[in-house]
Amino acid sequence: MTPRALDLLDLPIIYHYRDEAVSLDSTRLLTRGNPLGAAGFMSYFNPARHLYTAVNQENGITLLGGVIQTNGDSFAKLVYIAPSTQLTHPGLPALIEHLSAEAGKWGAFHVLAEVDETSEAFPALRMAGFSVYAWQRIWDVSHITPSNATSGWTQTQSVNLPAVQSLYHQIVPPLLQPVEPTPKRAIGLVCAEGSKCYVNVTYGMRGIVLTPLIHPEATEVATRLIGLLNHLPERRNRPVYLCVRSYQAWLEPALEDLGGKASPRQAVMVKHLARMVKEEQAVRATQPAGVSIQPSRVSHIKVNKHE
């Protein structure tokens, strides 16, 4: 059966699958909780938001999945697929393709997904056109022992934005920059001294996720991290997690020494909905074997939306 949008008659299915969702967006899971929990699923019926869920019913099994795009982003994210007992179902790749096509209608150039490297969902994502562009590990740093370390961090101001963008270009590999765009807003925290440390902070009722950009030449990194955790604004006893991408893997020994707890390694995957070409047009992406990312510089982009 062809995948379709969720409707009100599907509410019993959502309730049945409420504990069987497989998250594909770690930050959203850790800050907001279960994507099919009572607090969040009604938002999928709001047509004003770029938040969409779909159903695929095949061979007596119903599959669910969700995708979201934050206002202003050039990419979308898969939120979840369900149920966890049907990750090898032959209809799952078609559902993922359908969700990606919806993101294309919003103007997204890419769709991202985060999945444990041993997950049974990995093959379905590959069949739906996703490829690995980075790896990451989520570290639980909630119980790192406090110390007398001073904060050393301040709220990012507009005057700090050029330094943050420069740090981004120094750390994020050029081939990944089309997928992970340059920070455009003065949010997060920066080191009070120098311009070698920045962290984006995502708050939610369930927890806080830190995404760092720390230059390898930064000094006293462990002390700076402890100071950050000791003085994190509006923490309110919520658990705190730190997301380490593969290009920042040198941070992991320091986190381990501090007492952080690592999650299983995750593949960060991307599906290209459009690629940029010199004719200043965006066309449907073709992905040659062995090539994950094809960045180009253009001054204007026109998007061919999915049919």
Task: List the model feature ranges, each with a label.
Residues 52, 75-80, 96-100, 113, ...:
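Short, structured motif recognition centered on aromatic/hydrophobic residues
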Residues 116-118, 128-148, 241-307:
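Active-site/acyl-donor-binding loops of N-acyltransferases
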